[in-house]
């Protein structure tokens, strides 16, 4: 009875839902998967999107975009390190001087006819005149130092007593090296005191010329002279020919090496033995031959040694040197000729000009300023 009632209720419910079809219990539902897009248009009420339009929060986060426009101006400071290595001044080499192909002006003892022989004062005056080389004589002292001095003793220029080789540098430099010099008569010994203008300057009795000191009138060391004139070449005569020659040669070579002066010096001696001994220890230094070698070359027809220049007087022992045979030998040997006047009366512009006319390559002048004027006037130098 209860079952019948249930069936009746189900039938009535199906009819009420509008289904007139038979209630096929097969319930063939569509495949659950392919459900149509549940477009659940849940039309919600306008969600008043509170766009809280806040006032421009002038949070000027001052991102001060410090436009550090890091314009990385890569200023590639190409530090062109111009290392101006200020090199010390250098004198011309002897080869460079000879290559000039023009007469050279050599100041004999600094220009002994114009200034006190072999003093720093004379050498400075010669440099001011524009000479090419400074000519000087050297001797060894008792304490092994090379000094610039002509004679074996000191009387000739200082009026003092003593032998250079037996005196120390200190003893020599205490002397007045301008004692006997006179512009009117060099080397006269019998003039009035007033005719010796620089007498007493070394000892402080007389004021030195402006720009100079008492030391400029003393016997000077070779090294000091060479250091004082770094841009001038030197013509150095070794005066020692005795037992002191070896010491003089050693001292000269040592000074040349210390000063890096080997290529800007010509070394000469009257003694061929001294020149040969020097060449043994310094074969790369320019030299001029000694007397014996010169005679054997000119008169004996022997070959001249390795010398770029010969130095001669116009006359030697009463014999005229500057003759045709001499110049023929010079041309064949391919050497330069430097002449040193052998008397005071030859120390003048006229005689200098005569020598130049002969084709002389250089003059060891006692008046270098006068010779420089001859060179300028004759158009020999630029």
Language-model features: where?
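C-terminal motif of bacterial Sec signal peptides marking the signal peptidase cleavage site
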Residues: 13-16
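Sec-dependent signal peptide recognition
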Residues: 2-9
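Phosphate-group recognition and catalysis centered on beta-loop-alpha active-site segments
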Residues: 18-23, 85-382
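A periodicity- and composition-biased signal for non-globular, repetitive helical segments
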Residues: 8, 61-62, 114
């Amino acid at each position: 009875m209860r079952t019948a009632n249930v069936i009746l209720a189900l039938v009535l419910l199906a009819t009420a839902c509008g289904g007139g079809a038979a209630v096929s219990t097969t319930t063939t539902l569509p495949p659950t998967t392919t459900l149509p897009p549940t477009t659940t248009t849940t039309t919600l009420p306008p969600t008043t999107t509170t766009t809280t339009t806040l006032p421009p929060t002038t949070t000027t986060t001052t991102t001060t975009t410090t436009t550090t426009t890091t314009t990385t101006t890569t200023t590639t400071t190409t530090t062109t390190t111009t290392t101006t290595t200020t090199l010390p001044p250098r004198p011309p080499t002897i080869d460079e001087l000879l290559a000039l192909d023009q007469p050279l002006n050599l100041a004999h003892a600094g220009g002994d006819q114009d200034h006190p022989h072999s003093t720093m004062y004379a050498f400075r005056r010669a440099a001011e005149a524009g000479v090419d080389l400074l000519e000087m004589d050297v001797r060894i002292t008792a304490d092994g130092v090379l000094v610039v001095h002509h004679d074996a003793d000191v009387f000739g220029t200082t009026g003092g007593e003593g032998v250079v080789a037996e005196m120390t540098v200190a003893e020599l430099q205490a002397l007045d090296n301008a004692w006997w010099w006179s512009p009117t008569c060099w080397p006269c010994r019998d003039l009035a005191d007033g005719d010796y203008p620089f007498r007493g300057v070394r000892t402080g009795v007389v004021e030195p010329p402006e720009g100079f000191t008492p030391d400029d009138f003393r016997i000077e060391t070779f090294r000091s002279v060479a250091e004082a004139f770094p841009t001038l070449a030197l013509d150095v005569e070794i005066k020692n020919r005795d037992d002191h020659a070896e010491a003089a040669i050693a001292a000269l070579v040592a000074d040349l090496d210390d000063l890096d002066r080997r290529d800007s010096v010509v070394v000469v001696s009257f003694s061929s033995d001294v020149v040969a001994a020097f060449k043994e220890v310094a074969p790369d230094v320019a030299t001029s031959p000694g007397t014996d070698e010169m005679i054997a070359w000119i008169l004996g027809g022997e070959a001249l040694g390795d010398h770029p220049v010969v130095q001669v007087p116009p006359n030697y022992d009463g014999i005229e040197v500057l003759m045709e045979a001499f110049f023929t030998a010079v041309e064949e040997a391919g050497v330069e000729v430097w002449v040193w006047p052998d008397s005071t009366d030859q120390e003048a512009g006229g005689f200098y000009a005569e020598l130049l006319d002969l084709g002389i390559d250089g003059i060891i002048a006692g008046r270098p300023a006068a010779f420089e004027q001859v060179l300028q006037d004759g158009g020999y130098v630029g």
